[in-house]
Protein backbone atom coordinates (compact mmCIF):
# COMPACT_ATOMS: atom_id res chain seq x y z
CA UNK A 1 0.00 0.00 0.00
CA UNK A 2 1.57 3.26 -1.17
CA UNK A 3 1.54 6.10 1.36
CA UNK A 4 0.88 9.44 -0.36
CA UNK A 5 2.62 12.25 1.54
CA UNK A 6 1.69 15.89 1.05
CA UNK A 7 4.78 18.06 1.60
CA UNK A 8 4.16 21.73 2.28
CA UNK A 9 5.36 24.68 4.35
CA UNK A 10 5.63 28.43 4.26
CA UNK A 11 7.42 30.35 1.54
CA UNK A 12 11.21 30.09 2.18
CA UNK A 13 10.77 27.54 4.98
CA UNK A 14 13.18 25.14 3.27
CA UNK A 15 10.69 22.76 1.72
CA UNK A 16 12.89 22.13 -1.34
CA UNK A 17 15.69 20.90 0.98
CA UNK A 18 13.33 18.29 2.44
CA UNK A 19 12.03 17.46 -1.03
CA UNK A 20 15.61 16.67 -2.09
CA UNK A 21 16.05 14.44 0.99
CA UNK A 22 13.05 12.35 -0.12
CA UNK A 23 14.66 11.92 -3.54
CA UNK A 24 17.91 10.80 -1.90
CA UNK A 25 15.88 8.13 -0.07
CA UNK A 26 14.57 6.96 -3.51
CA UNK A 27 11.06 8.20 -2.72
CA UNK A 28 9.56 9.83 -5.84
CA UNK A 29 8.53 13.49 -5.58
CA UNK A 30 5.83 15.07 -7.74
CA UNK A 31 6.50 18.82 -7.73
CA UNK A 32 3.42 21.06 -8.16
CA UNK A 33 5.55 24.08 -9.14
CA UNK A 34 7.24 22.19 -11.99
CA UNK A 35 3.89 20.86 -13.20
CA UNK A 36 2.38 24.36 -12.95
CA UNK A 37 5.12 25.56 -15.33
CA UNK A 38 4.60 22.63 -17.71
CA UNK A 39 0.81 22.97 -18.01
CA UNK A 40 1.13 26.60 -19.21
CA UNK A 41 3.71 25.89 -21.92
CA UNK A 42 2.84 27.21 -25.36
CA UNK A 43 0.07 25.23 -27.03
CA UNK A 44 -1.15 23.45 -23.88
CA UNK A 45 -4.89 23.89 -23.05
CA UNK A 46 -4.19 26.02 -19.94
CA UNK A 47 -1.89 28.30 -21.99
CA UNK A 48 -4.62 28.86 -24.58
CA UNK A 49 -7.17 29.73 -21.87
CA UNK A 50 -4.75 32.18 -20.19
CA UNK A 51 -4.18 34.03 -23.48
CA UNK A 52 -7.95 34.10 -24.03
CA UNK A 53 -8.59 35.64 -20.58
CA UNK A 54 -5.52 37.84 -20.05
CA UNK A 55 -4.61 38.75 -23.64
CA UNK A 56 -1.28 38.66 -25.46
CA UNK A 57 0.32 41.27 -23.16
CA UNK A 58 1.21 38.45 -20.74
CA UNK A 59 3.34 36.78 -23.43
CA UNK A 60 7.04 37.14 -24.21
CA UNK A 61 8.17 37.98 -27.74
CA UNK A 62 8.68 34.27 -28.49
CA UNK A 63 5.06 33.55 -27.58
CA UNK A 64 5.84 31.78 -24.29
CA UNK A 65 4.11 32.96 -21.13
CA UNK A 66 5.79 35.88 -19.37
CA UNK A 67 5.42 34.50 -15.85
CA UNK A 68 6.73 37.56 -13.95
CA UNK A 69 4.37 39.84 -15.91
CA UNK A 70 1.39 37.55 -15.30
CA UNK A 71 2.43 37.30 -11.65
CA UNK A 72 2.39 41.07 -11.20
CA UNK A 73 -1.02 41.30 -12.93
CA UNK A 74 -2.63 38.80 -10.54
CA UNK A 75 -0.71 39.54 -7.34
CA UNK A 76 -2.58 42.76 -6.60
CA UNK A 77 -5.89 41.78 -8.21
CA UNK A 78 -7.90 39.17 -6.33
CA UNK A 79 -10.45 38.64 -9.11
CA UNK A 80 -7.77 38.02 -11.74
CA UNK A 81 -5.86 35.75 -9.38
CA UNK A 82 -8.97 33.62 -8.91
CA UNK A 83 -9.49 33.53 -12.69
CA UNK A 84 -5.92 32.32 -13.18
CA UNK A 85 -6.25 29.69 -10.44
CA UNK A 86 -9.45 28.41 -12.07
CA UNK A 87 -7.47 27.75 -15.24
CA UNK A 88 -4.21 26.41 -13.79
CA UNK A 89 -5.30 24.43 -10.70
CA UNK A 90 -7.48 21.81 -12.46
CA UNK A 91 -4.73 21.17 -15.03
CA UNK A 92 -2.11 20.78 -12.28
CA UNK A 93 -4.37 18.54 -10.21
CA UNK A 94 -5.06 16.28 -13.19
CA UNK A 95 -1.36 15.88 -14.02
CA UNK A 96 -0.38 15.28 -10.35
CA UNK A 97 -3.04 12.60 -10.10
CA UNK A 98 -1.84 10.95 -13.30
CA UNK A 99 1.75 10.76 -11.98
CA UNK A 100 0.60 9.64 -8.51
CA UNK A 101 -1.44 6.76 -9.98
CA UNK A 102 1.56 5.71 -12.07
CA UNK A 103 3.78 5.41 -8.95
CA UNK A 104 1.04 3.56 -7.04
CA UNK A 105 0.76 1.06 -9.93
CA UNK A 106 4.54 0.59 -9.76
CA UNK A 107 4.08 -0.43 -6.12
CA UNK A 108 6.16 2.37 -4.57
CA UNK A 109 6.34 2.37 -0.76
CA UNK A 110 5.58 6.10 -0.74
CA UNK A 111 5.16 9.03 -3.10
CA UNK A 112 5.46 12.71 -2.20
CA UNK A 113 3.26 15.48 -3.57
CA UNK A 114 5.28 18.66 -3.08
CA UNK A 115 2.54 21.33 -3.00
CA UNK A 116 3.40 24.81 -1.62
CA UNK A 117 -0.29 25.77 -1.35
CA UNK A 118 -1.61 22.36 -0.25
CA UNK A 119 -4.09 23.86 2.24
CA UNK A 120 -4.88 27.08 0.36
CA UNK A 121 -5.73 25.12 -2.81
CA UNK A 122 -7.74 22.56 -0.79
CA UNK A 123 -5.73 19.63 -2.14
CA UNK A 124 -5.42 17.63 1.09
CA UNK A 125 -7.84 15.03 -0.33
CA UNK A 126 -5.04 13.96 -2.72
CA UNK A 127 -2.80 12.78 0.14
CA UNK A 128 -2.83 10.37 3.10
CA UNK A 129 -0.43 12.27 5.39
CA UNK A 130 0.60 15.92 5.59
CA UNK A 131 4.18 16.91 6.44
CA UNK A 132 4.82 20.60 7.10
CA UNK A 133 8.29 22.18 7.01
CA UNK A 134 8.33 25.07 9.47
CA UNK A 135 10.73 27.81 10.58
CA UNK A 136 10.54 30.75 12.98
CA UNK A 137 8.91 33.88 11.44
CA UNK A 138 12.15 35.87 11.58
CA UNK A 139 14.10 33.07 9.83
CA UNK A 140 11.43 32.90 7.14
CA UNK A 141 11.54 36.65 6.53
CA UNK A 142 15.35 36.79 6.38
CA UNK A 143 15.60 33.76 4.06
CA UNK A 144 13.01 35.17 1.67
CA UNK A 145 14.68 38.61 1.55
CA UNK A 146 18.02 36.98 0.82
CA UNK A 147 16.75 34.39 -1.66
CA UNK A 148 14.56 36.72 -3.77
CA UNK A 149 16.43 39.97 -3.10
CA UNK A 150 13.23 41.41 -1.59
CA UNK A 151 12.88 44.40 0.70
CA UNK A 152 11.39 43.60 4.12
CA UNK A 153 8.08 45.06 2.91
CA UNK A 154 7.99 42.89 -0.24
CA UNK A 155 8.92 39.75 1.71
CA UNK A 156 6.25 40.47 4.35
CA UNK A 157 3.61 40.95 1.63
CA UNK A 158 4.49 37.58 0.07
CA UNK A 159 4.40 35.79 3.43
CA UNK A 160 1.06 37.37 4.32
CA UNK A 161 -0.49 36.30 1.00
CA UNK A 162 -0.31 32.68 2.23
CA UNK A 163 -2.02 30.89 5.10
CA UNK A 164 -0.03 31.59 8.31
CA UNK A 165 2.63 28.94 8.91
CA UNK A 166 1.38 28.28 12.46
CA UNK A 167 -2.04 27.40 10.98
CA UNK A 168 -0.38 24.89 8.62
CA UNK A 169 1.51 23.41 11.58
CA UNK A 170 -1.80 22.87 13.42
CA UNK A 171 -3.22 20.97 10.46
CA UNK A 172 -0.16 18.79 9.84
CA UNK A 173 0.22 15.11 10.70
CA UNK A 174 3.92 15.75 11.34
CA UNK A 175 6.14 18.85 11.40
CA UNK A 176 9.82 19.26 10.57
CA UNK A 177 11.51 22.18 12.32
CA UNK A 178 13.94 23.56 9.77
CA UNK A 179 15.64 26.22 11.92
CA UNK A 180 18.69 24.05 12.59
CA UNK A 181 21.30 22.31 10.46
CA UNK A 182 20.63 20.16 7.39
CA UNK A 183 21.68 17.11 9.41
CA UNK A 184 19.09 17.91 12.12
CA UNK A 185 16.41 18.27 9.45
CA UNK A 186 17.38 14.94 7.88
CA UNK A 187 17.26 13.17 11.25
CA UNK A 188 13.73 14.50 11.89
CA UNK A 189 12.60 13.30 8.46
CA UNK A 190 14.05 9.82 8.99
CA UNK A 191 12.33 9.48 12.39
CA UNK A 192 8.97 10.46 10.85
CA UNK A 193 9.37 8.02 7.94
CA UNK A 194 10.30 5.21 10.33
CA UNK A 195 7.19 5.96 12.42
CA UNK A 196 5.13 5.78 9.23
CA UNK A 197 6.80 2.44 8.33
CA UNK A 198 8.12 3.86 5.06
CA UNK A 199 11.80 3.26 5.79
CA UNK A 200 13.46 0.75 8.14
Curated annotation (Swiss-Prot):
One of its GO terms (biological process) is coenzyme A biosynthetic process. Residues 4-200 form the DPCK domain. Transmembrane segments: none annotated. The keyword Cytoplasm applies. It is found in: Cytoplasm. Pathway: Cofactor biosynthesis; coenzyme A biosynthesis; CoA from (R)-pantothenate: step 5/5. Keywords: ATP-binding, Coenzyme A biosynthesis, Cytoplasm, Kinase, Nucleotide-binding, Transferase. Its main location: cytoplasm. Its EC number is 2.7.1.24. ATP binds at residues 12-17. It catalyses: 3'-dephospho-CoA + ATP = ADP + CoA + H(+). GO terms for cellular component: cytoplasm. CDD domains: DPCK (cd02022). The keyword Nucleotide-binding applies. GO terms for molecular function: ATP binding; dephospho-CoA kinase activity. PROSITE patterns: DPCK (PS51219). Catalyzes the phosphorylation of the 3'-hydroxyl group of dephosphocoenzyme A to form coenzyme A. Belongs to the CoaE family. This is Dephospho-CoA kinase. It comes from Bacillus cereus (strain ATCC 10987 / NRS 248). The lineage of its organism: Bacteria, Bacillati, Bacillota, Bacilli, Bacillales.
Amino acid sequence: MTVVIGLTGGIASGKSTVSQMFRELSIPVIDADIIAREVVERGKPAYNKIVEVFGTEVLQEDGELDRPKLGSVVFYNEEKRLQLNKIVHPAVREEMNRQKEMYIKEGMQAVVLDIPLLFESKLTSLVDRVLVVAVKPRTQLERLMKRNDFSEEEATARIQSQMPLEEKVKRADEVINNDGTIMETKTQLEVILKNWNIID
